[in-house]
Amino acid sequence: MLWRQLIYWQLLALFFLPFCLCQDEYMESPQTGGLPPDCSKCCHGDYSFRGYQGPPGPPGPPGIPGNHGNNGNNGATGHEGAKGEKGDKGDLGPRGERGQHGPKGEKGYPGIPPELQIAFMASLATHFSNQNSGIIFSSVETNIGNFFDVMTGRFGAPVSGVYFFTFSMMKHEDVEEVYVYLMHNGNTVFSMYSYEMKGKSDTSSNHAVLKLAKGDEVWLRMGNGALHGDHQRFSTFAGFLLFETK
């Protein structure tokens, strides 16, 4: 145990020895302010080069927010922007109030006249044998517009247009042949001819499409022979307007 205490006090004396030497040097030298020049020999090591700057330390914590600054001045007016796209259709608005009556309009142009209806059909209920004269029909079944004259057997065109005519005649058995002519204002358009020996009857027919002016007349004229007529109406004459013309 004794030798351990001896070693302890020797180490302690070696630790304080430089400090005591430095204090002696300091007390013997004049005081000129600051550390004595020779004290660095016992208290400090030799001077060396400055070391390199160490790396930056980690960022510190965020600071406390500052006070709200004053409002700045108004900026200059900006340029007009580009035209935007067309928006969606809006909802239907409420119904507006009824407006006032407008002024009376000008008189309009004449309208299209209604379509004129013209048609007739006549027949022979009795025999007819008056040669070279207009055929007078004893019965008129249809006379729309009343433009067929029952007394004269003639049709008068009320308007200019295109008309259709047809007739069918039965030869009387007492004659061999018969001629019938379709007349237009006194001119023969065409004729119908029927032939058969006596004692026998025969029926012939013909048709025409005529362009008539207003006031023109159309009728049938009897030539040679005789026509058969009874309640069965074998001999007929008919016509109607197809369409008007200017």
Swiss-Prot record:
Residues 55-64 have a biased composition (Pro residues). Residues 80-107 have a biased composition (Basic and acidic residues). GO terms for biological process: fat cell differentiation; intracellular triglyceride homeostasis; negative regulation of gene expression; negative regulation of gluconeogenesis; negative regulation of inflammatory response; negative regulation of interleukin-6 production; negative regulation of monocyte chemotactic protein-1 production; negative regulation of non-canonical NF-kappaB signal transduction. GO terms for cellular component: collagen trimer; extracellular exosome; membrane. GO terms for molecular function: identical protein binding. Residues 65-74 have a biased composition (Low complexity). Keywords: Collagen, Glycoprotein, Secreted, Signal. Expressed in colon and small intestine. Disulfide bonds: none annotated. It is found in: Secreted. Residues 113-246 form the C1q domain. Its main location: secreted. SMART domains: C1Q. Residues 53-110 are annotated as: Disordered. Residues 51-113 form the Collagen-like domain. Residues 1-22 form the signal peptide. It holds the Pfam family Collagen. This is Complement C1q tumor necrosis factor-related protein 3. The gene is C1QTNF3.
